[in-house]
UniProtKB/Swiss-Prot annotation:
GO terms for molecular function: DNA binding; DNA-binding transcription factor activity; nickel cation binding. Its cofactor is Ni(2+). The keyword Metal-binding applies. InterPro entries: Acetolactate_synth/TF_NikR_C, ACT-like_dom_sf, Arc_rbn_hlx_hlx, CopG, CopG/NikR_regulator, Ni_resp_reg_NikR, Ribbon_hlx_hlx, TF_NikR_Ni-bd_C. Binds 1 nickel ion per subunit. Keywords: DNA-binding, Metal-binding, Nickel, Transcription, Transcription regulation. Belongs to the transcriptional regulatory CopG/NikR family. HAMAP family: NikR (MF_00476). This is Putative nickel-responsive regulator. Transcriptional regulator. Ni(2+) binds at H79, H90, H92, C98. GO terms for biological process: response to nickel cation.
Amino acid sequence: MGETIRFGISIDETLLESFDKLIDQKGYMNRSEAIRDLIRASLVELKWEAGEEETVGTVTLVYNHHVRDLSDKLTEHQHTHHDQIISALHVHLDAHNCLEVLVVRGKAREVKQIADELIGVKGVKHGKLVMTTTGEELH
């Protein structure tokens, strides 16, 4: 981690008031912490857009396990990408519906592709990809 640098910014009063409310809601100790998090989030998002950076993501799926062959298709996709899918959690939500959370690691474009494949399987009721960084380059 490098040396901490102080700098000033000019900001509209109304925008600052809204930002201060956000800081309170999220529990930040000060504006600096909130601004650092915003900068980090922007840098992480840029890496996802590039597609070649190593990222980690979670793919969350909700589906009815009674749908014919659906569980088998999802398992087949997971085995196809066993090098990238590093963990899986399966939860029975009720007598019919299951929640599956998969941790996927790889290049951003690969993680997105795997998520799209899984979410696109016929019978998946809801799916969502949440990507983050490996943290290696953030300070």
